[in-house]
């Protein structure tokens, strides 16, 4: 069993999901993504969503809310993921969606850039100066806007590829940043073996 298969089995993750790695806190704004998923489901667009992060008690509220919207089967709530497993969650994800109400110091966009995954990100003051045109910006409290962004990236392959290309270029510009060196070393190590995998 290869490492990726082991991670999938151990964490029970699906493939091709929407991914948001962040602590379960109100200002991380998981709710907007949950609401967007409900909008998509009502349009017969079925997506899987994976959350992961440290929890100090707020995750239970999100789980109850997801159940209320009948999204139990669509959303997987994971706890904190260690640095060794995290790259593999990016590998199976289709898109990173971050609706945090605070930024722009978050690391996940850079992880997604390295892994060549498209990014949807909150349009907050200071974000554009950091991430430029490498992400699709959304109003973080507008679930309709987030749902439209998700559909745009899944339905428009050229646009998706453009975001991936610009994101990777942005990553290359910051490749020597020490803040990301540990994660990127893990990525480099498993990439050596990835080409031998049968997924």
Can you name each region flagged by the protein language model?
Residues 82-93, 114, 128:
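Short acidic alpha-helix that forms the nucleotide-activated donor recognition element
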Residues 88-104, 117-118:
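Acidic donor-binding loop of glycosyltransferase active sites
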Residues 62-84:
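Nucleotide-activated donor-binding/catalytic signature segment of Leloir-type glycosyltransferases, i.e.
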Residues 136-143, 152-157:
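Conserved acidic donor-binding segment of nucleotide-sugar-dependent glycosyltransferases
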Residues 12-28, 34-37:
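Conserved donor-binding/catalytic core segment of Leloir-type glycosyltransferases
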Residues 18, 33-37, 49, 112, ...:
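A structural motif in glycosyltransferase catalytic domains
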Residues 158-194:
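A charged, aromatic-enriched C-terminal amphipathic alpha-helix characteristic of glycosyltransferases
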Residues 48-63, 79:
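Glycosyltransferase donor-sugar binding loop
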